[in-house]
Structures are given as structure tokens and as C-alpha cells.
Amino acid sequence: MNIENYLSETLAKVFQKLGYAESFAKVVTSTREDVGHFQCNGAMPLAKFAKKPPLAIAEEIVEHIDAEDIFAKLEVAKPGFINITLAPKFLADTTNRFLNSNKFGVQNNLPNRKVVLDFGGPNVAKPMHVGHIRSALLGDALQRIHRFCGDTVVSDVHLGDWGTQMGMLIEEIKLQSPQLVYFDENYTGEYPTESPVTVQELAEIYPRASKRCKSDINEMEKARLATFELQQGRRGYVALWQHFVRISIDAVKKDFDSLDVHFDLWLGESDANKFIDEMISYFQANNFIYEDEGAWVIDTNKDGVPPLIVIKKDGGVMYGTTDLATLWQRSKDLDPDEIIYVVDKRQSLHFKQVFSVAERTKVVSEKCKLKHVAFGTVNGKDGRPFKTREGGVMHLADLISQAKEYAKNRMPDENDDSIIDQIAMATIKFGDLINNYANDYFFDLEKFAQHEGKTGPYLLYTAVRAKSILRKIFGDNYDIKSLAKDYKVVNAHNEYEEKLQLQLIQFPIAVQRAYENSQPHHICEYAYSLANSFNKFYVNCPITNLDDESLKKARIALCMATVKAMTIASDLIGISIPERM
């Protein structure tokens, strides 16, 4: 139950009864806890239509509200705010209900939706680096949130395995080892099962090939021709390319596993290639495509969005073509309700073109919503893209090692490597996901690793503190689900209990915002606020040594609720909580 929605519906009945539009009855969490728990600001915009002062409207609404079981206090403040304080029993009962529900008050979406999530997107032959974490962590959080809310999710890594960089690699290896059978057009036998290069060598070859092509137009033309021949099915090139893909996927899977990020599909741009001819024929049959200076293009019919080039003058295909073919494939195979791309904001124009063409040509069905989660860049302390101390790109494996080092330095007596791993992951993931995805942010690992402030380790520390209370009372093998039946939250005895209860019941609000806006930072902010509320409760409300047995049980219930909410919230952003720290 989203408490904001519940209160909005309660007030909406009064608005309707008085002849006002229900849409003005929206209730939100109060921006000032000293005046109330929640507030309704609808009287201000309503005044324009009702031709009455907003203060008079607010007073009229409050006068007609009859819900003493929900509200302890309803106050009107200038120029027309309605400040709402919940009744202690309603607050306690709601917290109790959440404690005893599987998803801590969150209800499944109805009807069930099928969502395709496209994220990760590493390129073949390029090791994953710090710049890849945004798509990986944001995409993973979104698939966790969508599944939690009841959606059927299909996640696809969508490898970059079919562009000009493949031709660059082929030409560079040909230059380096021209004797390899892959380059003999007359060879008809079986190709070797072992790759002629390792993934480490591939990572060294690509920068060399890229530099050569950028500095020499003739080399770039060779690479483009090799790419074209690969896409046309030249046997030796396809066999060599298959080696590139296989060894790259093996390496990338290890990187994603280290982040606990997983995919349902491991498809790449190449998998959509077989649909391109069918799709082009469809475009031609329906007069969507036309020739322009030797290339074939499709208009977007959107102001400020240029036409999309589908086939180049030389007959090669563009990234946009492959992305359209991928949408074609997903639409036919999966028939989704929504496809979400988690790709950096520098690709915004590209996706506007692709989405516009896909919708206009009905490559996707009318029910299918296309969304680009356009995230900002990961920058260092200097405001520039994050680099190593030596000025190079920091590989993901090195970043994780550094996070583990920070964790170990702060806990030198911790000998359990799994706990160090959990702290390192919380450091990286929370440090990234606490930021609104649309913004660039400064990646400061030293700051993220602090055990105080808005950090992953602080969340873990707080959750472990709450767990330690339960372990002290019930032993190591306690089970919150079965215990919660005998331990109930009761009316708050002081402000610390009240604020903790109030924070606990806002979990569904955070989940709904994260879900609807593709913004996991709402979950992070919730978890941080919950941690703060619990720590104040912990300091000011004794539990284990309490003589009052009924009060002790009520506070134990609040500890249970905190552990449950914190565990679920942490899992939604890919963080696991240790038993001890």
C-alpha cells in the first residue's frame, strides 16, 4: 500500500463530495516534519478554477473530513496547505501490516507487463572499465525493481559485436599474421577451434588498430571493407570473428559476475543481422524508405530529428539499422509492453531517430512503449571522465580491487573475505546509484568507502546493528517471518519510535517512484533515511535491557521491520547485507 496514494484517495472522496476535481486531492510526504507527516497542496491550484481563496477551500475540505481512525490532526496553513498528522494507531497498524507482508507493503502491478531491458552493452575486444558501471548497475537495479513489482523482465546485454571495430581487428591481425588460414580465400577446410589471440592480446590489438585507422584513411577503408565482407558472410572472417566474440564474452561474464549482474539473453548486434533483409523489404513494400544521394533513408517525421540512414552508399548497414532490426526481432519474439534502453545520454539523438522510425513504421506494436534511460557520465574529482592515477582508463577489475582495499583498510581485523567483498560492492553500487541517473557525477571511491554519511558501508553498518539486536535475543537462526506473528508494533511512545514508523511505511512510495521514473536513487535515498531514523531510535530507545516486556517486544518488532525493509531495499539495488561487520 502506497500511503500517499491511500491518503490521496481518502481526501479525493471529500473533494468529489464538495464538487471539486479529485485530481487536486494529491497527498505527498511533508517537506517539514515539524508541521505534519504529509500534506495536500491542491487548494492552491484549485482556487483558480473554483474562484475561491485557497485558504477557504482548504478549510472547507478539512471541515468535511471524517476519518479519526486515520488522522490525529488536520491543520490548514497559509496560503492553503493542509498539513496531515497520522493517528498513532493507524501508523502502528500500517507498520505492522508491512512487517507481515512479503514485500513490505508493495503490491504487484496489475495487469502483469512484459519488459525488455537493454543494458550493459560492452564491445567485443574492449575490457570493461569504470565507465561501464553506470549502465550495468542502473540496468540491474531496474530489472530487480521491475521484477519485484511483478513485471516479467527479459534482460539483454546487447553486445557491440558487429560494427566497424570488427573490421579494424581483422585487418590488424591480417597485418600482424597474414599466414593465418582465416585470410586465405581459397581455404575450404575446418578452421581452428582455438582462437589465434587471447582476450588480453585482443585488448592490446584494438587500440593499435583504431589508432592506425584514424590516422590513415586508406586503413579505415580497408577496415570498412573487411566489416562489409564479414557482414556478407566471408567464411574466414566469420570464423575469426566468432573467436573474438567467444573469448570476449567469457571475459565479460566474469566482470559482470563480480558485480552480481546477470542477463537473460547474451545477444549482440550480429544476432539482429539476419532480420535486416526482411525488414528492408518491409520498408520498401510500404514506401517508408527512399534513396538520397546513394544512401537509403527513412524520415522520422519529428521536428529537429534528422532522417535515419538505413543503408550506406557502399551497401553497408549503420548502427541505427541494427538497432531497428533488434527491435524487429524483440517485437516478433517477445511481444513486449515496453523496451527500456539504459545507454549514456550522448546517444540521445540516435535513440530519438530509431524510436521515431520504429513507431512510424510499426516495427514495434502500438502497445509497446520505447524508453531511453539516458544517464550522465562518471567523472573523477577533476570533473573529467574518471581515469587512473596514471591518466589511463581504469579497468573494472582494478576498481573492484581498489574498493576491497579501502574496505580492508577500514576494517583491518576482518578476516572474512566475503564480508570485505560485500562492503566493496556496497561502496561501488550505492556510490553510483544514489545519484539521479540523468546527472553526471564525481566518482570518489575514498568518499564512497566512508562508514559515515550517505554511503553503502553506512547502510550495511546500520542493518548489521539492527540484526545484532535480533541475534542477541533470538540466536543466529532467527526467522523474522515466523517471529513477526508474536511481536507487534504498537503506538509510538516517543518521537524516535514515531519517526521510525513513519519512515518504514514510506517504502512503497520509494519503490513506486523508482519504478515509474526508472530512478533507483529513490530506493537509495529511502534506505539512507531509514538508516538515520533507526540509528536515532537505537541510541534513544533501549531494547535488550528493558524491564517493560510489552514495550520491549514492540521495539523488537521495529527492529524486525527495519531489517526487513533494509534487506529488501538493499537487494533492489544489488547490495547484500552481511550478518556481522
Curated annotation (Swiss-Prot):
The keyword Aminoacyl-tRNA synthetase applies. It is found in: Cytoplasm. It catalyses: tRNA(Arg) + L-arginine + ATP = L-arginyl-tRNA(Arg) + AMP + diphosphate. GO terms for molecular function: arginine-tRNA ligase activity; ATP binding. Signal peptide: none annotated. Keywords: Aminoacyl-tRNA synthetase, ATP-binding, Cytoplasm, Ligase, Nucleotide-binding, Protein biosynthesis. Its EC number is 6.1.1.19. Pfam families: Arg_tRNA_synt_N, DALR_1, tRNA-synt_1d. One of its GO terms (biological process) is arginyl-tRNA aminoacylation. SUPFAM superfamilies: Anticodon-binding domain of a subclass of class I aminoacyl-tRNA synthetases, Arginyl-tRNA synthetase (ArgRS), N-terminal 'additional' domain, Nucleotidylyl transferase. One of its GO terms (cellular component) is cytoplasm. InterPro entries: aa-tRNA-synth_I_CS, Arg-tRNA-ligase, Arg-tRNA-synth_N, Arg-tRNA-synth_N_sf, ArgRS_core, DALR_anticod-bd, Rossmann-like_a/b/a_fold, tRNAsynth_Ia_anticodon-bd. A motif ('HIGH' region) lies at residues 122-132. Its main location: cytoplasm. Monomer. Belongs to the class-I aminoacyl-tRNA synthetase family. HAMAP family: Arg_tRNA_synth. This is Arginine--tRNA ligase. It comes from Francisella tularensis subsp. novicida (strain U112).
